[in-house]
Amino acid sequence: MTDSIPSGYKPLTCDTLPGYLSSRLTPSCEPGGLPEEWKVSEVGDGNLNMVFIVEGTHKTIIVKQALPWLRAGGEGWPLSLSRAGFEYNVLCQEAKYAGHTLIPQVYFYDPEMALFAMEYLTPHVILRKELINGKKFPKLAEDIGRFLAQTLFNTSDIGMSAEQKKALTAEFALNHELCKITEDLIFTEPYYNAERNNWTSPELDDAVHKAWADVEMIQVAMRYKYKFMTEAQALLHGDLHSGSIMVTDTDTKVIDPEFGFMGPMAFDIGNYIGNLLLAYFSRPGWDANEQRRADYQEWLLQQIVQTWSVFTREFRQLWDNKTQGDAWSTEMYQQNRAALEDAQDQFFATLLEDSLVNAGMEMNRRIIGFAGVAELKQIENTELRAGCERRALTMARDLIVNARQFKNMDSVIQSAKVK
């Protein structure tokens, strides 16, 4: 059930936004010039919110406002406006641990209007678009690996006291509406004939019906849905894919954490890996040059290996040097370094398995379920698109059903190459 709409709430437009902002912006984030002269455009291309660019004489800012329904689903899919507050709070938490080198600055939040203003990122572009274009980013793996390590470690029981962790869990437990969307769209609907499913038909019909009859895969999906619902390990971004990352050659910013909540670490990691694999399998639809395509596919696979390597290295370093955190208490290992390393190895082995399952779940969702990805959906030749998707579905099943057999990320990318 959605919350009641505040009496002062109203959706803003390009015409009404300047007047609203004129009395609320501080000098440090003021666009400059007269409000009536600001250039305002609505650029939201996501599923949830209105996104405005406000350009003045001195500065450009972003304003993001939640609507009382899912933008991609219309007024027939109501949603609480409180999701704007959750996104704002996740951005603040992420900036606390990952810093503004990876997280955009937020200028102010208005709960009654379900709106916040934030830094305009330029010349950054959405990563997904650049992956379609076949562009490489030398800092990407280092930045995303560090983002994952800092945010997941520092909001977990390993990195914070039990009291702090439980308070954080309580704060984000109320973001249940967006969690329900994830529970439905990723963990449930791709595995039966749900109304919102949207696959390449009829070319992929046989593969989709095979997935619906795959009891072994469905059992794993249900088990990981339960883990998603019950394992409050750390504060997640909740929707970490290439559409939630903006990049330049030298800078990376993670955006759009409105799905943030306390959940299993492997969900964020798996989402990102799954999207890199989708980009990998989509390449025949975007580049007919075999040598160039193979080179870029290798770069995509190495992003998976390198991101995991950076993540585990940074996470382990934070763990080694921690000064608080009630899980794996420091006192237990002061005289036994080998025991700590063994505990860490076991932790990462479990996390790898869970991350791979989640990667496969994300891949299935994007091919069979609601809200697919541009790198596949925009391949105009349906036979070619279906071929890419069929290979991706084969990989997804392998990750879901056989995750434990993959002992490292190198074995994962070798499996992808033979699909």
Swiss-Prot record:
Top-level enzyme category: transferase
Q: Which residues bind substrate?
A: 239, 365
Q: In which pathway does it act?
A: Amino-acid biosynthesis; L-methionine biosynthesis via salvage pathway; S-methyl-5-thio-alpha-D-ribose 1-phosphate from S-methyl-5'-thioadenosine (hydrolase route): step 2/2
- Keyword Cytoplasm part of the UniProt annotation: no
What EC number(s) does the entry state? 2.7.1.100
Write down the chemical reaction(s) this protein catalyses: 5-(methylsulfanyl)-D-ribose + ATP = 5-(methylsulfanyl)-alpha-D-ribose 1-phosphate + ADP + H(+); 5-deoxy-D-ribose + ATP = 5-deoxy-alpha-D-ribose 1-phosphate + ADP + H(+)
Q: What happens when the gene is disrupted?
A: Inactivation of the gene precludes growth of the strain with 5-deoxyribose.
- Mind listing the UniProt keywords for this protein, alphabetically? Amino-acid biosynthesis, ATP-binding, Kinase, Methionine biosynthesis, Nucleotide-binding, Transferase
Q: Name one GO biological process term.
A: L-methionine salvage from methylthioadenosine
Q: Which residues are recorded as binding ATP?
A: 49, 64, 256-258
Listed GO MF terms? ATP binding; S-methyl-5-thioribose kinase activity
Pfam families per record: APH (PF01636)
User: What's its job?
Assistant: Catalyzes the phosphorylation of methylthioribose into methylthioribose-1-phosphate. Also catalyzes the phosphorylation of 5-deoxyribose to 5-deoxyribose-1-phosphate. Part of a bifunctional DHAP-shunt salvage pathway for SAM by-products.
| NCBIfam families found in the cross-reference section | MTRK
Q: How does it assemble?
A: Homodimer.
HAMAP family the UniProt entry points to: Salvage_MtnK
Sequence similarity: Belongs to the methylthioribose kinase family.
Indicate what this protein is called per its UniProt record: Methylthioribose kinase
Recorded source organism is: Escherichia coli O45:K1 (strain S88 / ExPEC)
